[in-house]
From Swiss-Prot:
InterPro entries associated with the record: Globin (IPR000971), Globin-like_sf (IPR009050), Globin/Proto (IPR012292), Leghaemoglobin-like (IPR001032), Leghaemoglobin_Fe_BS (IPR019824)
Originating species: Zea mays
Binding site for heme b: 55, 69, 73, 103, 107-108
Record carries keyword Transit peptide: no
Protein name: Anaerobic nitrite reductase GLB1
GO terms under cellular component: cytoplasm; nucleus
Cofactor: heme b
Gene encoding the protein: HB
Length: 165
């Protein structure tokens, strides 16, 4: 399954990718809070220094898996990411509100988020999804669909990561 390209060279999120994302999101949605936390714990397992990027974790003695602020943040990020992926084909672009994208861009810029951070997060997202789905549902095509959706969300955030003029 190849990703299609538009006339301007942009990657088009196709019907097959959309179907895979929608089908898998339907399975995961009911457990979004738990999966969001697992997603962030995986990020911190891969890149422990990432914890320091979150002010609410810096001086906390609460174990990560019990931290209420992390739980709330993790679920919010996971749901927004998955919902943006689920809407990608219908909208033809990332559907996160422009004000939200601007805020995300500014926040990621302020905390020094770099390409490597997005890569770790993307890897953790794919691993979380893989573990959340029944084994017979996960496939190379599923992985590619989610990777493309994540890639387009990251591109939208990066476009907003610019210092104030």
């Amino acid at each position: 399954m190849a990703l299609a390209e538009a006339d301007d060279g942009a990657v088009v999120f196709g019907e097959e990718q959309e179907a895979l994302v929608l089908k898998s999101w339907a399975v995961m949605k009911k457990d979004a809070a738990n999966l969001g936390l697992r997603f962030f714990l995986k990020v911190f397992e891969i890149a422990p220094s990432a914890e320091q990027m979150f002010s609410f974790l810096r001086d906390s003695d609460v174990p990560l898996e019990k931290n209420p602020k992390l739980k709330t943040h993790a679920m919010s990020v996971f749901v927004m990411t998955c919902e943006a992926a689920a809407q990608l084909r219908k909208a033809g672009k990332v559907t996160v509100r422009e004000t939200t994208l601007k805020r995300l861009g500014a926040t990621h810029l302020r905390y020094g988020v770099a390409d490597g951070h997005f890569e770790v997060t993307g890897f953790a997202l794919l691993e979380t999804i893989k573990e959340a789905l029944p084994a017979d549902m996960w496939s190379l095509e599923m992985k590619k669909a989610w990777a493309e959706a994540y890639s387009q969300l990251v591109a939208a955030i990066k476009r907003e990561m610019k210092p104030d003029a």
